[in-house]
Amino acid sequence: MYILEISLKFTPMPVSVQRKEAEAAQAAYQQVVEALRSGQPSVLELHCEFQAEKKLAVLTSEIASVQLYEKSGGSATVKRPGFAVIGE
């Protein structure tokens, strides 16, 4: 399972959709990146393959960042890429 996570400007919680296949996840990631590169505000619509009823529409001018990562199949938790604080 692959997670495409989109962070929006001035919004503390990201929005995300999931893809089952790596190729589909990469295609969705490229769709978001191309929308950002265009510089033209538009509505970007995505759907989730894990929860079929979950749909997402965002205004591309409000996207701050996008990341794609793989959810490990062995546990219910997801380790997101980036920095993590480890307690002693």
UniProtKB/Swiss-Prot annotation:
It comes from the Bacteria. Belongs to the UPF0367 family. This is UPF0367 protein Synpcc7942_1638.
